[in-house]
Amino acid sequence: QSIETLREAIALGKEREVDFLLAVGGGSVIDGAKLIAAGLLYDGDAWELVRKGASQRTVPLGTVLTIPATGSEMNNGAVISRRETKEKYPFYGNYPLFSILDPEKTFTLPQRQVACGLADTFVHVMEQYMTVAGQSRVMDRWAEGILQTLVEIAPEIRENQHDYDLMADFMLSATMGLNGFIAMGVAQDWATHMIGHELTALHGLTHGATLAIVLPG
């Protein structure tokens, strides 16, 4: 989500004295709402919050997920871009108070978005699972379970995106891939994501597509 758009949302929210946010969408929408939640209680420019990297003073936020991918519905992270300078940085706020995950909301997604979401989820897990081998057998087995689920369901989703159970597995995999669970006691390397962010900032490529390009094969 771009800071230019989010500044407008923050200004409108302050004018209307907004005290609760409901983000309905995918990772970009939820990420943007996290910065809005912080910006509503900040007197300066919201980009300053992004460059600081974090803010724990926010208005409450809930989410309704429509595109599984980023795990933003169950973590406190966000990624915010700035079109003017072609920059893209991580930002950390508060966790959503609740998130609603209804697989039926994914039935009409374009297949390209689904593919990008699957790639994003897969790389999230890989950047935790593959960094240092053998740190935690329990976390390794959990990570492998998510990876195996993605490998199994991806071709099935391509053939039948209206299967409730398939899309439920996809949604849960995306959430579990980046909610901190499989990261417990595990070193992480996010180089693939950092390079992917640069490709998005400089060339406007979809995040999941950049990860599919960059992840070592």
What do the predicted segments below correspond to?
Residues Q1-G44, G53, E156-M167:
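N-terminal small/polar loop signature for handling phosphorylated ligands or for N-terminal nucleophile
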Residues L41-R137:
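A glycine/threonine-rich phosphate-anchoring loop and its flanking beta-alpha core
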Residues R7-I10, Y92-S99, D120, V186-H193:
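Acidic-glycine-rich active-site phosphate/pyrophosphate-binding loop
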Residues I30-A38, V59-G62, M74-A78, C116, ...:
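Residues on a specific face of well-ordered alpha-helices
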Residues I3-L6, S28-K34, G71-M74, Q188, ...:
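Short glycine/serine/threonine-rich phosphate/pyrophosphate-binding segments
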